[in-house]
Regions:
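Class I SAM-dependent transferase core
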Residues: 3-70, 113-120
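Ser/Thr-centric signal marking residues that sit
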Residues: 44-47, 80, 99, 148
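Conserved SAM/SAH cofactor-binding pocket of Class I
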Residues: 61-139
Length: 151
């Protein structure tokens, strides 16, 4: 088991969140794809496996503890960047109807490729938040932003 899987499994067990082998493999693949794309388009400063697991994946999953996300909820991640927190949430909660919005097309291209490779069903939108906010279908979606760290 790799450091990513070990770190994720330990956190999941401590927080009573079920993670199976398929989900752990998706996190492994996500980290690999993230690092590969990061060399081309600078998605993150965090590239060490354990840091990716803790600072990207686990931080994203803290949303599950902070919010009661109903089954089949529709979620839009505005300014999704490299897909945090939305893609880790979708890996753990496949029932979520996920939309990811970002203003940079290169990040949308990354997210489309990532979702294809991970077998994740999600919608991506290349738009600025203020423009998408004028579009009625998106007004009713839940907005979850990445938890911030206190320094």
């Amino acid at each position: 088991m790799s450091i990513i899987s070990e770190t994720m499994k330990k956190w999941a067990d401590e927080n009573e969140i079920a993670l199976d082998e398929v989900q752990l493999e998706k996190f492994e693949d996500y980290a690999k794809i993230l690092v590969e794309w990061n060399e081309k388009i600078n998605l993150t400063a965090i590239t060490e496996p354990e840091e990716i697991a803790v600072k990207h994946f686990i931080d994203s999953l803290t949303v599950l503890k902070a919010f009661n996300i109903k089954k089949n909820a529709s979620i839009i991640d505005v300014g999704t960047g490299a897909g945090f927190p939305s893609v880790p949430l979708k890996i753990v909660r496949d029932d979520i109807q996920l939309t990811m919005l970002d203003s940079l097309n290169k990040r949308i291209n990354f997210l489309n490729q990532l979702c294809d490779e991970l077998g994740i069903k999600a919608e991506t939108i290349h738009s600025r938040a203020e423009d998408a906010g004028r579009n009625k279908p998106y007004l009713s979606l839940i907005h979850i932003s990445e938890p911030t760290r206190r320094r």
